[in-house]
């Protein structure tokens, strides 16, 4: 007889809720903070890809709870963002109402899956009680000089009516487009809020060393931060200084021209009148190109001579100044000294435009750029020195002669922190009549979004909030002010949500971050012990949240500077056709349908059994069927069976061996092999007369099963005569002495050659060993017909038969 998954799931979900089984406890010294990357509550709801990561954290949370840990396993909603606003624009609905409806749908799906979330810890980044703290943190960043309002080059998306951060842009056909919707993106100068994450570049780099993260993610962050030690050299053009950052100041004698990024603010100042039209056209052409295309070395180099010259401070030569899209404005100073003899891109550019090439490092082949090591030539006082020696000498010379300075440079740019959209956190900022910035008082937080129909982007660079005059205009006493009308990006709320869970007393009810109670809780729970989510957040959310955590740590509010000690990236679940699930492919699997036909337990078990957690694998309905079939086998094994209270010891070895292996495998997140071990145990149990099987071994199996298929495990636990939740039981222990086999393999030889082996109990005497050898079929074949036989036996090792 098979079990009814619908009846069992409904029964136990009701039990868990009524008995508050998953409430966060605070009774043990040991803690486990296990966290999912919280979802954006889209209209589409959960898909089976979400289920994979959420099931993994649920398995681990249940495991640590049974091991006696206080477990914090919360869930919440990354609720602000473009999709809700885009939907609201199409339908005329308020994005807040749309988001709340989606959250209810998402939550219902999570409950159906039997996840062990503490819903008293539920948070919503778009709830005013939540973003009150987001606004307060922004104020602290501003007070410390880490938030600035600047006129800067930004990524402008006309279709979305807002600026986008670098991590929100992708490349398509050589052009920049928005990650959401793939709309065109261009460079544009605008006044924007930025957070000076660059001030924390060194801390963010060093902090990676002690994190248990995938090396690939750490390398992505290191490369994104991009620390370079070098020198900034001043090239003069009349009375204008052109600072150039280089890691190879030793090649300055080979610098034969200067190249500026087209966006560099010096370009128009340096361009001669006869070149102005040509330069402006080139700047406009470059604005649409993606960084990937501009850095592509295989592309034919383009550029324009701007009509001006600079002086090489070492050679005193007059060299041309060009602009080209292969130089990026957001690295260094947006200018390079071109050394075509020793840089491939400079070589390609110089050969195309017939510019001078001077070798300053010795090479036998001067037909192409030489980028290897060698002695310096044509370099005055650097001649005959190698790279390391010459760098030290030239850096000292440049600083001593006031030609520049040693400098550390980062590829990391400051975080663009404002958006020209309605649906985001309002800034706690006012402007007086002289445009001075005034921070809103703490007592007046949160600044909430108004109820309005003006949510359509203006496409002029202003937020829709600028149209809501009764919200924008504020009178305090007899003074009039205007509110900041830009809103914060979606990444604001997600940069500290892991802290908010700790502060939550009940749904969206947070205690004061600066309170003594907050300090006590934060000291207990931080950092997050296990964080599971996708690698695509490596240089966005994972970097921003580290920055905010470091900042709050420096304020003395947090006990640790790093938010996530252990990070794991789960693989994707692909469609049955081995392609990424997509509505356009028609290969999306809806978990609601699977729960209806197979049940949540089978779905959970299948996704954890598919393969390694970090592997991306195709969906298989055959695999799902097999998971349900095995769960039914488990049910039949226990249903209506009276097990023995006396241990006949037949299953001692396999049970204790499985418990040990499963414990280790769960710790290492090797869930598929842990399930394989449970199958080994079930097979062994079925080989016995079920009524003779030791009941504590059956109970231990049910405890282990509960990690993966909690509804069925609760039902089986009850059928075994227990009246409390299996979730709250202690994790099964194993007896190491029962795992050590009391047998040994004996080698059977004839004239010193191995002919067979036998397995016997340790300590078996010589006479018995010889007798067993004489009865062995393989040995009989080799000694048959021989009479003069000599037997040499060594206990626990060998029997050698010598034919004389």
Swiss-Prot record:
InterPro entries: aa-tRNA-synth_I_CS, aa-tRNA-synth_Ia, Leu-tRNA-ligase, Leu_tRNA-synth_edit, M/V/L/I-tRNA-synth_anticd-bd, Methionyl/Leucyl_tRNA_Synth, Rossmann-like_a/b/a_fold, tRNAsynth_Ia_anticodon-bd. SUPFAM superfamilies: Anticodon-binding domain of a subclass of class I aminoacyl-tRNA synthetases, Nucleotidylyl transferase, ValRS/IleRS/LeuRS editing domain. It is found in: Cytoplasm. The keyword Transport does not apply. Coiled coil: none annotated. It is an enzyme of class 6 (ligase). GO terms for biological process: leucyl-tRNA aminoacylation. Its EC number is 6.1.1.4. Belongs to the class-I aminoacyl-tRNA synthetase family. GO terms for cellular component: cytosol. It comes from the Bacteria. It comes from Mycoplasma capricolum subsp. capricolum (strain California kid / ATCC 27343 / NCTC 10154). Keywords: Aminoacyl-tRNA synthetase, ATP-binding, Cytoplasm, Ligase, Nucleotide-binding, Protein biosynthesis. A motif ('HIGH' region) lies at residues 39-50. Pfam families: Anticodon_1 (PF08264), tRNA-synt_1 (PF00133), tRNA-synt_1_2 (PF13603), tRNA-synt_1g (PF09334). The keyword Ligase applies. A motif ('KMSKS' region) lies at residues 580-584. ATP binds at residue 583. This is Leucine--tRNA ligase. GO terms for molecular function: aminoacyl-tRNA deacylase activity; ATP binding; leucine-tRNA ligase activity. It catalyses: tRNA(Leu) + L-leucine + ATP = L-leucyl-tRNA(Leu) + AMP + diphosphate.
């Amino acid at each position: 007889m098979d079990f009814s998954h619908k009846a069992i799931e409904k029964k136990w979900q009701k039990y868990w809720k009524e008995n508050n089984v998953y409430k966060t406890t605070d009774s043990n010294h040991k803690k486990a903070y296990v966290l999912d990357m919280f979802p954006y509550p889209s209209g589409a709801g959960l898909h089976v890809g979400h289920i994979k990561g959420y099931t993994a954290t649920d398995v681990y949370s249940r495991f640590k709870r049974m091991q006696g840990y206080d477990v914090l396993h919360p869930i919440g909603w990354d609720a602000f963002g473009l999709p809700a606003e885009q939907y609201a624009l199409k339908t005329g609905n308020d994005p807040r109402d749309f988001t709340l409806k989606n959250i209810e749908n998402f939550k219902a799906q999570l409950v159906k899956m039997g996840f062990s979330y503490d819903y008293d810890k539920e948070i919503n980044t778009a709830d005013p009680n939540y973003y009150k703290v987001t606004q307060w943190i922004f104020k602290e960043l501003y007070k410390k000089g880490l938030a600035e309002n600047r006129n800067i080059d930004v990524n402008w998306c006309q279709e979305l009516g807002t600026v986008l951060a670098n991590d929100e842009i992708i490349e398509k056909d050589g052009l920049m487009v928005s990650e959401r919707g793939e709309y065109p993106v261009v460079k544009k100068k605008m006044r924007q809020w930025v957070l000076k994450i660059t001030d924390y570049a060194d801390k963010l780099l060093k902090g990676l060393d002690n994190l248990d993260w995938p090396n690939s993610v750490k390398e992505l962050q290191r490369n994104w931060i991009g620390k370079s030690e070098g020198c900034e050299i001043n090239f003069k053009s009349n009375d204008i200084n052109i600072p150039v950052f280089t890691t190879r100041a030793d090649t300055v004698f080979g610098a034969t021209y200067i190249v500026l990024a087209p966006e560099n603010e010096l370009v128009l100042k340096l361009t001669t009148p006869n070149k102005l039209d040509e330069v402006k056209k080139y700047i406009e052409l470059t604005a649409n190109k993606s960084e990937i295309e501009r850095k592509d070395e295989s592309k034919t180099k383009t550029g324009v001579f701007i009509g001006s010259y600079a002086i090489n401070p070492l050679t005193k030569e007059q060299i041309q100044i060009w602009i080209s899209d292969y130089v990026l404005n957001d690295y260094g100073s947006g200018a390079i000294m071109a050394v075509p003899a020793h840089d491939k891109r400079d070589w390609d550019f110089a050969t195309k435009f017939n510019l001078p090439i001077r070798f300053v490092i010795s090479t036998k082949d001067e037909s192409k750029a030489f980028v290897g090591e060698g002695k310096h030539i044509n370099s005055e006082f650097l001649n005959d020195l190698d790279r390391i020696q010459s760098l030290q000498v030239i850096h000292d010379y440049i600083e001593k002669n006031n030609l520049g300075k040693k400098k550390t440079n980062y590829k990391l740019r400051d975080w663009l922190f404002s958006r020209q959209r309605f649906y985001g956190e309002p800034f706690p900022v006012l402007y007086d009549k002289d445009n001075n910035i005034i921070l809103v008082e703490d007592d007046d937080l949160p600044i909430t979004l108004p109820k309005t129909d003006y949510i359509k982007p203006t496409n002029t660079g202003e937020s829709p909030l600028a149209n809501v005059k009764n919200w924008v205009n504020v009178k305090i006493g007899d003074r009039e002010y205007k509110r900041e009308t830009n809103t914060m990006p979606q990444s604001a709320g997600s940069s500290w949500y892991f802290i908010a869970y700790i502060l939550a007393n009940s749904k969206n009810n947070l205690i004061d971050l600066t309170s003594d109670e907050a300090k006590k809780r934060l000291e207990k729970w931080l950092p997050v012990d296990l964080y599971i989510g996708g690698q695509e957040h490596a240089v966005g959310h994972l970097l921003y949240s580290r920055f905010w955590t470091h900042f709050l740590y420096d304020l003395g509010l947090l006990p640790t500077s790093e938010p996530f000690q252990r990070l794991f990236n789960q693989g994707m679940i692909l469609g049955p056709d081995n392609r990424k699930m997509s509505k356009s492919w028609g290969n999306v699997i809806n978990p609601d349908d699977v729960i209806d036909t197979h049940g949540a337990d089978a779905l959970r078990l299948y996704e954890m059994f598919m393969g390694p957690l970090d592997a991306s694998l195709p969906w298989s309905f055959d695999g799902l069927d097999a998971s349900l079939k095995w769960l039914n086998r488990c049910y039949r094994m226990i249903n209506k069976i009276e097990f023995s209270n006396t241990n006949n010891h037949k299953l001692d070895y396999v049970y204790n061996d499985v418990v040990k292996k499963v414990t280790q495998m769960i710790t290492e997140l090797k869930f598929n092999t842990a399930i394989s071990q449970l199958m080994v145990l079930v097979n062994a149990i079925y080989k016995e007369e079920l009524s003779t099987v030791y009941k504590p071994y059956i109970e231990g199996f049910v405890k282990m099963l509960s990690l993966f298929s909690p509804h069925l495990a609760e039902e089986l636990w009850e059928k075994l005569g227990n009246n409390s939740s299996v979730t709250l039981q202690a994790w099964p222990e194993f007896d190491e002495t029962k795992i050590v086999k009391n047998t040994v393999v004996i080698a059977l030889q004839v004239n010193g050659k191995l002919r067979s082996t036998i397995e016997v109990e340790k300590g078996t005497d010589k006479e018995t060993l010889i007798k067993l050898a004489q009865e062995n079929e393989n040995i009989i074949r080799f000694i048959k017909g021989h009479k003069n036989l000599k037997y040499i036996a060594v206990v626990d090792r060998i029997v050698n038969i010598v034919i004389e």
